[in-house]
Amino acid sequence: MSISREPRVAVVGATGAVGNQLIELIAARGFQLSELKLFATEAGAMQTVDAAGEERLVDALASPADLRDFNIAFLACPAPRAAEIIAAQPGPILIDLSAADRPPADVPMVAPGLTSREAFAQLRNAKVFAIPHPVAHVLATSLKALGAYSGFVAATAMLGASAGGRDVLTASVDQTTDLLSARLELDDDEVQRGFNAFMREHERSVATAISAQVATLLDKAPTLSIQVAAIPVLHGSALTVDIQRPRALKGNGEDAVELLRVAPGILIAEEGEPLGVIDAVGQEAIVVSVETRADSISLWCVFDNARLAALGALWIAETLALSSPTLA
């Protein structure tokens, strides 16, 4: 199937946290398409979502074959459902957003500012693309900007509820309401999300995936030590990064700030101004505060994880549609 400059597009998982952001960005960035079809699981079907100011009905995806007439399909759905669709090879080019929590496999993982147009052009026959975890995107972008390809880097990611999707968002809101009413009751295997920060095996596995993704995105990466924790924030995430100062960076630290300032997707915070996760919600940019020392550079990064994931997925579609009138 060929891809025209105005492809037929499907979004699977349209009612989810990332799916909603994806639909909003398609309109905001003026992505030209001939058709936009919204799908969800049976639980999300028959809901309506706002698409370019128009209320659109979301249909249930009965089977992967429902996607056969589309050129591009965004898989903003849980990993098992995405894997089922990919295995079925229904026809369109598939952009797998569920890959963000896994180490890179045999599917090309690409990201804006990190994958060159030349490298992307070599993937024109690919039928599936994967996006990295937003934390991997932020970390790799920062390291590339600073030329930190060696040495040691320590990072701690703090993920808001939206990083886990709409179900986690809903659970966090419900738990917080119950806690404030002093009536929260948890099952034995249920973790308290409201007013609590925690790290489980899931967060540890995500940290392992992020480390592998950064190595893939950079080709040459420093030694990384990454931890991931869940924090009681609904939207947005944060990342602290401590970097052994690359030898090429000298002086009082202004060189590091300027390198980050010109990096794609990064917005430097005003010096002395407080910077919280809430400041990044709804933004496409990664907002960064920089602190420099004689032998190290420390970054405090805040970003809208759902929006950044959607932006990376849409960039793939934009690149596919613009690289040629038709792509085989």
Which residue ranges define each predicted feature?
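Oxyanion-binding "anion nests"
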Residues: 190-234, 240
